């Protein structure tokens, strides 16, 4: 049991010694992306090899003092596209291996764990340059990690490793050197703004909750993260769960709350498992529960698993769901800080916001403000996806430009394709163009151009992307996820989706563009909650920045990107066709005819424009008009 400050300091001292005593640590990425590509089997294989290796003492239990080799499951190591990822650490020397397979494990163990060789074929390679360690990889080296600083470096489930890395130092400092009001003052002075999308200053929320007369206060964490392609919060919850919990404990200490709730979306089973494990361990050692560290401060944590509704990311809908009611937004005021969970004053922040708090308390508000911009201090995590060379999880200072993220960190577009747009902020965000590449990525700057930082999804699109279809896709998502409580969102998004579907089907009219703009602005102004207010942004931003594509779809009945099925027509070039019959044999509706070894043709009246012929032609004889 860790019952007082002295006991915590002793555990930290011992944990640091154990961590430093390893001859080698095999760090297997167990982020969701790597688990999907087989990292669990790789972890098991390394355990099997190490167990049978002569003269090797492997760690089987936590805090094993006799072990000199540790096989660890870490959080996300970042370069998700190149998984499964494995790091071999000997002291300060770290080798980063990529795309590791089961058959590579024995070789890695013999050459890099027991020996000092590096296996070059498994290293990160780009443009003829080979990168040996994580710090040599531009994707990682050009980041500034605060929230993600432990991810990929330590065992995500080990309390000892978290404490050894500086964990709970901030809580210890707050409880023994600062009163609750001073903690709030530091958070407020740091200028940290909510990382869930709204960008409201976190300290202002805490200031409003703390002095309220009601003796019951709550802290709640929004771990919903429903944006398609976003996985930042999930990576923190599964890769560094103790950091999130420490951040919530600091909030609870500051606003005098005794209970905290983490709402986790249903699609994050590994996050739920890691958080449950962390809470159980902390309760067992006395760092959660009653009279923590003998200070009289008591705090209990609970996990609520969502049912997958996107709207539950909205504060009042989230608290309603935790209470057992249907997750739908309510009219405000009163706001969550006044009447939140069970109508009690509630601090509600997202995962990334809480994960920043320990560093702010430990290093001070001035240190935090030295990073980022004046109006948006600190760093921001982003999930970088789409038509880009390096996809994965990144963390950069606020104010970093899109150009730096896409071309310096992301490595540019795949196959040398031309950049067209970047969709930022998920279904609630907007699409920015090449002329916006040098815009600082912070809460205020991107807003001027019809986008939002949001939770941090970045989808890079190349010249083969149809922006009208992008707008239709996101409007379809938000329309399906609308709770239906208010008319502007329930009916308005449906009408906008119908117009967009009409345009991509080749039946649009020029007056439809005015209708989309009118509806979009009406929904943005009149909807009840943030989901409805931001739902039209992808449409409005593409109308502003890519209006010519809408006109092309309507007037010319043409999709230059060849994405909209209704506007495609497939043609066989008789000069290239060899009459192999493969296209005819695979056509699901028999629209292709021709004799063997003679040029074939497509009956456009029968063609359903599925593209099967294009996929099957090995001679490049079929093209799309």
Q: Where are the language model's segments positioned?
A:
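Hydrophobic alpha-helical positions that pack around
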Residues: 142-143, 272-398, 410
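Gly-rich Lys/Arg/Thr-decorated short loops/hinges at beta-loop-alpha junctions or inter-strand turns
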Residues: 153-169, 221-233, 336-341, 383-388, ...
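C-terminal accessory/binding modules appended to enzymatic or scaffolding proteins
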Residues: 376-390, 396-398, 402, 563-608, ...
